[in-house]
Amino acid sequence: MALTKAEVEYVAMLARLELSEADLERYTTQLNAILDYAQRLQGLDTKDVPPTAHVFPLHNVMRDDRIDPSMERERIVANAPEEEDGFFRVPRIV
C-alpha cells in the first residue's frame, strides 16, 4: 500500500501543517518507506515467537520512595522580585 502525495497533503491539512512542495515529496517518500518496511514485517513467520511487550524483562523498576530535605523558604523567596509573609507576591490576574 503506497501513499500518494495528495493523501499526505490531506493528512497535513487535517493536522493544520503547512508543508512546502519539497516537504510533501520528502514525507511521501519517507512514509512509503515506513509502510513498505511494515509490509515486509507482516510477511515474517512469527508462529513460534511468543508475544512480548518489551524486549527486556522489566518488572516495576522504581526508585525508593524517600523524603529529601528541601531548601529553606527564606532562600527560595530571596530571589523573588516581591515577597509577602514568606510567599511570592504576584500581580492580580482576575
Curated annotation (Swiss-Prot):
Gene3D superfamilies associated with the record: Glu-tRNAGln amidotransferase C subunit, N-terminal domain (1.10.20.60)
Listed EC numbers: 6.3.5.-
GO molecular function (one): ATP binding
InterPro entries: Asp/Glu-ADT_sf_sub_c, GatC
Disulphide bridges, residue numbers: none
Catalysed reaction, written as an equation: L-glutamyl-tRNA(Gln) + L-glutamine + ATP + H2O = L-glutaminyl-tRNA(Gln) + L-glutamate + ADP + phosphate + H(+); L-aspartyl-tRNA(Asn) + L-glutamine + ATP + H2O = L-asparaginyl-tRNA(Asn) + L-glutamate + ADP + phosphate + 2 H(+)
Alphabetical keyword list: ATP-binding, Ligase, Nucleotide-binding, Protein biosynthesis
Its biological purpose: Allows the formation of correctly charged Asn-tRNA(Asn) or Gln-tRNA(Gln) through the transamidation of misacylated Asp-tRNA(Asn) or Glu-tRNA(Gln) in organisms which lack either or both of asparaginyl-tRNA or glutaminyl-tRNA synthetases. The reaction takes place in the presence of glutamine and ATP through an activated phospho-Asp-tRNA(Asn) or phospho-Glu-tRNA(Gln).
Similarity-based family: Belongs to the GatC family.
Protein name (Swiss-Prot/TrEMBL): Aspartyl/glutamyl-tRNA(Asn/Gln) amidotransferase subunit C
Species name: Heliobacterium modesticaldum (strain ATCC 51547 / Ice1)
Native organism taxonomy: Bacteria, Bacillati, Bacillota, Clostridia, Eubacteriales
